[in-house]
């Protein structure tokens, strides 16, 4: 029962149960429409106003469409998409009786080609011109909204919250919209789960989220059914303003005509109907690539394949639903599954640009249901030696070239599981590997929906594949992420991307200031900017005076403040590399002109190789090395360095050692650079210059440093953090090479730079998830006096690339303080070195086995490409797992490690679930499987404690106990189950019944 005491502009309804009030609401018809229009994009609901002839709804010029998900200050989170345009006609007050004029669903498409688009609107952004970027529609009509000011209800009656809405709409018969604003950190309660969250404009600084509910949303008589040919006019009306309406209507026509797609795939179309009007359309097809999905995505995190028939897998092709009824999205999906006789639905999101063109051939329509699906993690794939495996190779459905799409999924079970919405504003500054890993971890938490993830980056999201997959890279790789990994994640579907540079942090107001004075508010700020190559500061020495390095004061700490010459390049990401490549081609550098590469890092080698590869003559390339700052070289392996330097010499590249940059253009105006002067330990020299690459020591960008310093964040050479990633501001965390541990840990030699960036990002996300995930156990902070040790991460530190001589290089090592290789090998506990091949021949393969018989370091140098992802899996494995590697090597049975690791027996080592098998086997050996029999682990402890008197060697005793007890059969069963369950990836292993 609801009661109200009406006032001219306000009412206070309450809910009662048996005469006792259990809920209360305060509603008001006075709404600050001007503020809402300034702060929120209300275009989908015609500004919450009654349509008026003088409304200004379009900008003076058409939008300029740009094929990039990284439009400046553009957001690409699906929750922030403009799904509908203004309604053509208002909904009449009698809509509850029978709606004839429900707003037509519309989409502001970003494509000019109606034949197809990218798979999801979030993958394309609109780049606005100066004149239109700030355009806001002007609404002249009267307000059509009232607002909820207060609301409360007893928890046990919370599910009945929507019952209020029938009554309050009856109090305002002339209003069609109800609004409510709540602090954005407020958890979503039952009432607003039926509302539509409105997208704020970029310049909105309100600390409130706005939700809107339409009168028509009260209709309970929504009917989902199979489409018929008679529904075509209704669907046309629904999607008439969609850019993809042609594609949807063609598929609907094809369904009505043949029930199959043009390629013969069975398909079905469904409509959602309210009051005899079509308000939603969905088209599904049978999923024909089930084997590919199972083998390339972790879909088994959500389903057991054996529980689903092949024909029960469906592919969601189109989905469009009037946002007035968005709270029925899950119901729509459930009905699609029921009526379509499906148990699973899949929705792929393809990368937006491939080779610079929109991939309309891969296009689907916008699915406004994306946030009701879960993203599925891609699986790491084995690189198979197909020719060597022959008939034992996996099927083509498994081993074919990856399609590189991000997969989203739902099933019957998931439609019944609610997602926990996290509205906290989490802002990540810097698209480094740490930042991407952090975002990846949050996005793939399937039971959480982060609605306010924002990335601020100079060039937006990485992975645009600007240089092409096969193009030589200027920069070495850390193998954390590749271009295909970004496509498989599709972070732009879930993360707002702001293109810009951080220039200030207002800790009091909790917002970040960007280079063009825009602000981005935050609740949690994550700083992952890393370090970048900086423009070197010439010492200013006059080489005509024949000065040497000894006469030059140390200028490494000086910052270059003059204009950066147009032909000077510091390469920090793929955008920088692409600009450099374009400049080379536009200025005829390939045919003529000296190129100077200045620095001591591995990137100097990869850049020289790229220059040689694109056609620059070696005699035009000058590799200038400044005096080293460490005794450890960038490669730290004499054999590899010797092979590379021989290749440089053969190519005609000139190398200068221990040279300091003295002047550009003999001290005259440096733009552009025509010459560069250097001092050396003996005689200075001068080089003509058409292009200058600088790879001097990396450092924190000055603008970033100034922003941190002005914000009074503790900075001591790097941003100071504790072991939980906290800065001195509880709301600001930082990670990566930007940071250092506080001096209280007495561990200045160890920083995040010593570890895998991907693992650092994962651990940062894990530390933050405890704030948002109610399923996690609360983390107990250790007492301050016990917080004395820094965490030690175990993931491999990797670097690789193509070096001069077209050598493919890979180095995998455990995190460590850099030490010269010769010093490492001289230590008593070094272990064993296994080397095959020769570096100069391009057949070099080195494995370091430590004193515990574990693989600790891998170095490869090859003229031929090799499966780097396979070799990374070898790190941390015991040598016996590698088919008794040490014994075979000592017996001279392994002439070539490259060939050795293409043999069929080792494919399981490269499988992504091999680690799960290891954990399962360890669990068996550490658990007590029989009451009167201790576990194998307990036996080992008893032997170590001398509680058991043995007449034989401990290893032999443990082996005998293992074979004579239940443990052997349990281990064998577990291995066979593993091979059976993963047979599609591992068909080269014999199983019972194979022969």
Per-segment meaning from a language model:
Residues 416-504, 539-550, 585-586, 590-639:
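Beta1-alpha1 glycine-rich phosphate/pyrophosphate-binding loop at the start
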Residues 520-533, 687-698, 761, 853:
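Short hydrophobic core segments
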Residues 32-197, 287-373:
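Acyl-donor binding region in acyl/amide transferases
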Residues 1-3, 213-255:
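Short amphipathic alpha-helix that is part of the acyltransferase structural core
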Residues 1-17, 243-269, 273-275:
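Active-site rim helix/loop that mediates acceptor-substrate recognition in acyltransferases
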Residues 478-483, 489-506, 512, 612-722:
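A Rossmann-like FAD-binding core segment of flavoenzymes
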Residues 544-559, 563-585, 589, 683-758, ...:
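FAD-site-proximal beta/loop scaffold in flavoenzymes
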Residues 738-869, 916-970:
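Mid-to-C-terminal Rossmann-like scaffold of FAD/NAD(P)H-dependent oxidoreductases
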């Amino acid at each position: 029962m609801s009661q109200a005491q009406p006032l001219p502009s306000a009412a206070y309804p309450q809910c009662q149960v048996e005469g006792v009030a259990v809920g209360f609401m305060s509603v008001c018809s006075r709404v600050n429409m001007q503020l809402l229009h300034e702060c929120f994009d209300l275009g989908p609901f015609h500004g919450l106003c009654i349509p008026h002839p003088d409304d200004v709804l379009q900008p003076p010029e058409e939008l300029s469409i740009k094929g990039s998900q990284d439009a400046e200050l553009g957001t690409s989170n699906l929750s922030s998409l403009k799904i509908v345009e203004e309604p053509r006609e208002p909904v009449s007050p009698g809509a509850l009786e029978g709606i004839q004029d429900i707003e037509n669903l519309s989409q502001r498409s970003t494509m000019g080609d109606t034949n197809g688009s990218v798979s999801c609107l979030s993958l394309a952004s609109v780049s606005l011109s100066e004149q239109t970027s700030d355009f806001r529609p002007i609404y002249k009509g009267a307000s059509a909204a009232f607002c909820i000011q207060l609301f409360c209800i007893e928890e046990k009656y919370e599910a009945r919250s929507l019952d209020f809405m029938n009554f309050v709409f009856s109090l305002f018969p002339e209003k069609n919209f109800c609004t409510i604003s709540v602090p954005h950190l407020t958890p979503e309660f039952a009432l607003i789960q039926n509302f539509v969250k409105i997208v704020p404009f970029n310049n909105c600084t309100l600390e409130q989220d706005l939700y809107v509910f339409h009168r028509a949303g009260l209709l309970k008589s929504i009917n989902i059914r199979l489409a018929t040919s008679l529904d075509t006019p209704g669907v046309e009306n629904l999607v008439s303003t969609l850019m993809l309406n042609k594609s949807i209507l063609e598929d609907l026509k094809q369904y009505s005509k043949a029930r199959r797609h043009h390629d013969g795939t069975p398909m079905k179309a469904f409509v959602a109907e309210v009051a005899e009007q079509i308000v939603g359309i969905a088209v599904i097809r049978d999923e024909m690539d089930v084997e590919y999905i199972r083998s390339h995505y972790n879909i088994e995190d959500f389903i057991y394949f054996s529980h689903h028939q092949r024909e029960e897998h469906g592919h969601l092709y189109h989905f469009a639903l009037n946002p007035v009824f968005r709270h029925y999205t899950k119901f729509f999906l459930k009905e699609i599954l029921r009526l379509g006789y499906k148990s699973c639905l899949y929705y792929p999101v393809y990368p937006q640009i491939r080779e610079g063109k929109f991939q309309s051939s891969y296009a689907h329509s916008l699915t406004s249901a994306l946030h009701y699906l879960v993203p599925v993690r891609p699986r790491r794939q084995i690189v198979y030696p197909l020719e060597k495996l022959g008939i034992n190779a996996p099927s083509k459905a498994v081993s074919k070239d990856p399609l590189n799409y991000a997969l989203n999924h739902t099933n019957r079970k998931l439609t019944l599981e609610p997602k926990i919405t996290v509205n906290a504003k989490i802002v990540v500054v810097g698209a480094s590997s740490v930042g991407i890993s952090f975002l990846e971890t949050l996005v793939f938490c399937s039971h959480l929906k982060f609605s306010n993830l924002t990335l601020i980056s100079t060039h937006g999201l990485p992975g645009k594949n600007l240089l092409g997959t096969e193009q030589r890279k200027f920069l070495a790789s850390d193998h954390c992420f590749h271009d295909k990994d970004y496509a498989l994640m599709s972070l732009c579907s879930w993360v707002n991307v702001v293109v810009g540079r951080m220039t200030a942090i207002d800790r009091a107001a909790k917002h970040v200031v960007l280079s063009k004075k825009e602000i981005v508010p935050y609740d949690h700020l994550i700083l992952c900017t890393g370090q970048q190559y900086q423009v070197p500061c010439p010492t200013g020495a006059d080489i005509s005076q024949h000065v040497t390095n000894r006469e030059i004061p140390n200028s490494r700490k000086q910052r270059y403040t003059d204009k950066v010459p147009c032909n000077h390049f510091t390469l920090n990401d793929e955008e920088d590399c692409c600009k450099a490549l374009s400049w080379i081609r536009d200025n005829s550098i390939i045919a003529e002109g000296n190129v100077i590469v200045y620095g001591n890092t591995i990137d100097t080698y990869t850049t020289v190789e790229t220059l040689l590869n694109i056609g620059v003559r070696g005699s035009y390339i000058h590799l200038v090395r400044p005096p080293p700052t460490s005794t450890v070289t960038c490669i730290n392996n004499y054999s590899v360095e010797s092979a590379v330097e021989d290749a440089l010499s053969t190519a005609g590249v000139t190398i200068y050692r221990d040279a300091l940059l003295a002047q550009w253009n003999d001290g005259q105006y440096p733009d552009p650079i025509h010459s560069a002067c250097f001092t050396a330990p003996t005689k200075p020299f001068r080089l003509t210059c058409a292009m200058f690459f600088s790879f001097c020591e990396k450092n924190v960008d000055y603008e970033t440093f100034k922003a941190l310093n002005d914000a009074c964040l503790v900075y001591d050479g790097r941003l100071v953090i504790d072991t939980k990633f906290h800065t001195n501001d509880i709301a600001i965390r930082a990670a990566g090479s930007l940071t250092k541990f506080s001096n209280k840990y007495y561990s200045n030699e160890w920083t995040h730079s010593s570890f895998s960036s991907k693992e650092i990002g994962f651990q940062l996300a894990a530390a933050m998830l405890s704030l948002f995930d109610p399923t996690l156990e609360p983390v107990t902070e250790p007492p301050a006096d016990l917080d004395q040790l820094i965490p030690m991460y175990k993931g491999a530190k990797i670097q690789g690339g193509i070096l001069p001589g077209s050598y493919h290089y890979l180095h995998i090592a455990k995190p460590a303080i850099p030490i010269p290789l010769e010093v490492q090998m001289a230590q008593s506990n070094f272990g064993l070195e296994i080397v095959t091949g020769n570096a100069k021949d391009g057949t070099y393969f080195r494995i370091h086995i430590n004193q515990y018989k574990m693989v600790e370091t891998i170095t490869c140098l090859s003229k031929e490409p090799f499966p780097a992802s396979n070799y990374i899996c070898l790190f941390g494995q015991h040598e016996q797992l590698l088919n008794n590697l040490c014994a075979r090597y000592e017996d001279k049975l392994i002439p070539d490690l490259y060939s050795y690791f293409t043999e069929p027996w080792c494919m399981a080592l490269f499988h992504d679930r091999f680690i799960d098998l290891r954990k399962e086997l360890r669990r068996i050996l550490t658990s007590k499987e029989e009451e009167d029999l201790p576990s194998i682990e307990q036996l080992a402890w008893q032997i170590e404690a001398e509680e058991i008197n043995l007449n034989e060697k401990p290893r032999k005793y443990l082996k005998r106990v293992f074979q004579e007890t239940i443990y052997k059969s349990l281990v064998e069963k577990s291995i066979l189950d593993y091979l059976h369950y993963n047979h599609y990836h591992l068909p080269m292993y014999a199983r019972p019944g194979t022969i």
